[in-house]
UniProtKB/Swiss-Prot annotation:
This is Proteasome subunit beta. The gene is prcB. GO terms for biological process: modification-dependent protein catabolic process; proteasomal protein catabolic process. The formation of the proteasomal ATPase ARC-20S proteasome complex, likely via the docking of the C-termini of ARC into the intersubunit pockets in the alpha-rings, may trigger opening of the gate for substrate entry. Interconversion between the open-gate and close-gate conformations leads to a dynamic regulation of the 20S proteasome proteolysis activity. PROSITE patterns: PROTEASOME_BETA_2 (PS51476). It catalyses: Cleavage of peptide bonds with very broad specificity. It comes from Mycobacteroides abscessus (strain ATCC 19977 / DSM 44196 / CCUG 20993 / CIP 104536 / JCM 13569 / NCTC 13031 / TMC 1543 / L948) (Mycobacterium abscessus). Its main location: cytoplasm. Component of the proteasome core, a large protease complex with broad specificity involved in protein degradation. GO terms for molecular function: threonine-type endopeptidase activity. It is found in: Cytoplasm. Residues 1-54 form a propeptide.
Length: 292
């Protein structure tokens, strides 16, 4: 999103906010400078096909919190456009998003959503409830529907810690959205979006255990992204040569924090070592069977 000094300068400085009682920054922007919103206008099929796309995002709840993680690859048709894009973003003290789809739209969604939450808190003096945060992100997704119909699709996952839940151990929340802005709180404790989501969810389904700790959730997320990359060319797996690994954010009663890269690298190396050993044993078994 490019902010221009003259974009909302048709009135005296400061007059816009004094004249507006909108607690939604996106609605204020839509009224004052709609050209600054993501994905306005029309794009040709050729342009859309050549835009970088990012996948895959996974999210899991654990005892006392929630974790979201994403791979690092963005593709442009059959090319790898970027190997180290960060697809998960902290949006306020107790929420984070991961957005799969057209990379530029996804990045702008995350930035605009973070401003939306901050804008509300400054005007109202309180943070939105978690359901309120989901509704605000839903409105942004719905506002992108026209662009989505042209192929500029961005599908988010919202995760957060619900401060209104009296039971802190089950306060982790995952919300999925459709392209029309409909949202759903996931009751299974996990979800994935993006082109590799089918493979990632299949992996999580076998590995996920409700009530696990944050470290276990991180291990499941990394392995799920590894499985997604194994079958989906648009998803990037851990790259030991370039030292590029998934990124992750965890949220608990203490707030949202990025998982240190060293922790993710260690788990990724353990997953690769385990898979390498399993493949070696399978090859040895086939070889011994062939000799007999």
């Amino acid at each position: 999103m490019i902010w221009r000094d003259d974009a909302i300068a048709s009135q005296p400085a400061g007059q816009h906010f004094r004249n507006s009682h909108l607690s939604s920054f996106s609605e204020y922007l839509r009224a004052q400078a709609p050209e600054l919103l993501p994905a306005l206008g029309k794009a040709s099929a050729d342009v859309i096909g050549n835009l970088p796309h990012g996948t895959t995002i996974v999210a899991l709840t654990y005892r006392g919190g929630v974790l979201i993680a994403g791979d690092r690859r963005a593709t442009q048709g059959n090319y790898i456009a970027n190997r180290d894009i960060d697809k998960v973003q902290i949006t306020d003290n107790y929420s984070a998003t991961g957005i799969a789809g057209t990379a530029a739209i996804a990045v702008e969604f995350a930035r605009l959503y973070a401003v939306e939450l901050e804008h509300y808190e400054k005007l109202e003096g309180v943070q939105l409830t978690f359901n309120g945060k989901a509704n605000r992100l839903s409105a942004l997704v719905r506002g992108n529907l026209a662009a989505a119909m042209q192929g500029l699709v961005a599908v988010p996952l919202l995760v957060g810690y619900d401060l209104d839940d009296p039971n802190g151990e089950t306060a982790g929340r995952i919300v999925s959205f459709d392209v029309a802005g409909g949202w759903h709180v996931e009751s299974d404790g996990y979800q994935a979006v993006g082109s590799g989501s089918v493979f990632a969810k299949s992996s999580i389904k076998k590995l996920y255990r409700p009530g696990g700790d944050a470290l276990t959730a991180l291990a499941v997320a990394v392995e799920a992204l590894y499985d997604a990359a194994d079958d989906d060319s648009a998803t990037g797996g851990p790259d030991l040569v370039r030292r590029v690994f998934p990124t992750a954010i965890r949220i608990d009663s203490g707030g949202a924090v990025r998982v240190p890269e060293a922790d993710i690298e260690r788990i990724a190396r353990e997953v690769i070592a385990k898979r390498t050993e399993a493949a070696r044993e399978e090859a040895d078994l086939r070889e011994s069977g062939g000799d007999s």
